[in-house]
Amino acid sequence: MKAGATSMWASCCGLLNEVMGTGAVRGQQAGFPGSTGPFRFTPSSDFPTYPPAATEGPNIVCKACGLSFSVFRKKHVCCDCKKDFCSLCSVSQENLRRCSTCHLLQETAFQRPQLMRLKVKDLRQYLLLRNIPTDTCREKEDLVDLVLCHRGLGSGDDLDSSSLNSSRSQTSSFFTQSLFSNYTPPSATVSSFQGELMDRDGAFRSEVLAQVQSEIASANTDDDDDDDDDDDDDEDDDDEQEEEEQNPGLSKKKARASLSDLSSLEEVEGMSVRQLKEILARNFVNYSGCCEKWELVEKVNRLYKENEENQKSYGERMQLQDEEDDSLCRICMDAVIDCVLLECGHMVTCTKCGKRMSECPICRQYVVRAVHVFKS
């Protein structure tokens, strides 16, 4: 049994050697204590070793959304900033591809009012796509100035086309000048050609002179008319100023009612509510608590009576000018003191002078309001 098992084992080992190659199967050796089985497989020199898989290059992604390109998300290069964008983040326009940021700024035609309406994020993104630092920009206006300053960086095609057109125009003008300079007309037609040129020049000059003279004449007439109109306007203004100086209350009387318009108490009853309120407001009388017309009439009657009494007392005091009177206004020294200045509460002026005061003449405090007072 042992001899049969040994021969079977040897035949199996020989078969494996033929299949795997010589030395592919080795018995368990003492130098390999880590082996657990009776066989140890080693790579044969007959089989080639494959190189390791090459590491993939840097994955290119879209500059706008950050997603990698694929079959469904194709890569496009912006014609302005020359950066890579996907089909969703770029706009096709006249067989050219622009990213959404460049397209947005291109729509504004780089006009300052239109650029100021854009978001700061779009302006900053436009500058970053062109590798322009924006660290020093603190306001939106700084970004707009930076865009306008560097707008020539993205318009190389336009510059090239403009330079090409200018060079073409220069070359064409050069050729035309050279042709006309080298051309010599026949001697028989030189005199006739010069005569035609002189006739045309003379006619053209005469037409130009006629147009210039007509324009000068029309301009002079227009200037004369304008001067006449200005003189008329100045005369009208002078007349109006003279009328206002002679009657300073005329324009105000037309606009608002005044206490001086009243000649008697009977006229107060015929006035409207608006006129009554205007009279009270001009004399600094508060009518906020008045709900009926008769209340306004009563206040205007009282104001009118007090005004008449003040005028009578003023006429009497004019006869006694030498006597000192403490009830006269300290500003004009003509009218009676009938006004209190708020917030200080001093009574030193009349109503007319009080409404012109910006500060109290006694305490120098700012005058918030001047209020007419009635003497009891």
From Swiss-Prot:
Keyword check for 4Fe-4S, yes or no: no
ZnF FYVE-type residues are: 56-107
Q: What is this protein called?
A: E3 ubiquitin-protein ligase RNF34
List all Acidic residues biased stretches: 221-246
Any one of the GO BP annotations = proteasome-mediated ubiquitin-dependent protein catabolic process
Q: Which Pfam families match?
A: FYVE_CARP1-2, RNF34L-like_3rd, SAP_RNF34_RFFL, zf-C3HC4_3
- Zinc fingers (RING-type), as residue ranges, are 329-364
Which EC number(s) does UniProt give? 2.3.2.27
Q: What induces or represses its expression, per the UniProt entry?
A: Down-regulated in response to cold exposure.
Among its keywords, does the record have Transmembrane helix? Answer: no
Using the UniProt annotation, give all residue ranges assigned to the region (Disordered): 216-256
Q: Name one GO molecular function term.
A: ubiquitin protein ligase binding
